[in-house]
Amino acid sequence: MIEYNVDLASRSYPIYIGKGVIERIGSELSELNPTRILVVTNTTVGHLYTVPVTRSIQRALPEVPLAVCTLKDGEIYKTPETLRQILQAAAELHADRASVIVALGGGVIGDMAGFAASMWMRGIRFVQIPTTLLSQVDSSVGGKTGVNLPQGKNLIGAFYQPKFVLIDPRVLKTLPAREISAG
């Protein structure tokens, strides 16, 4: 496993890169001592990676309440209405200030889960598990979060850094060739 540190004076965070690193999510989360965990994913990624991610979390943190919020897939769903679904899932989980949101997906999921984390109780922690090439090299790094409006992309958002990013290159094998060539 390779570790890089994004050095941002007040809000630095590590990026862990390596085959199988997705299965380390539980042990990495245990370092944060979360009271509750909400995994946000989509219908495409969810059926591929929700089980290994939640299994890792439950093994490391068996007493911590865990919920999964599965959203429809695609940029057209990067809306305030979809964001509300994440916030509703956080409410149903009784997420508090010590809870953590896990973004499991590409850039759309990372943007929305990060924005939800920035809004919930004026900011709770979140982590990124990017599953597309573009999200691994761009959107999961830098803290840009937000949702779209009909008038334009990312009109509502915030800069909000994750606590850490887990990049597993193995997940790219499940992407269609078109996604890889698109970056």
Predicted feature residues:
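Short beta-strand segments
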Residues: 40, 70, 103-105, 128, ...
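Glycine-rich nucleotide phosphate-binding loop and flanking beta-alpha elements
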Residues: 46-47, 108-110, 173
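A glycine/threonine-rich phosphate-anchoring loop and its flanking beta-alpha core
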Residues: 16, 115-183
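Active-site and donor-binding regions of nucleotide-sugar-utilizing enzymes
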Residues: 95-127
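ATP/NTP phosphate-donor binding region
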Residues: 1-100
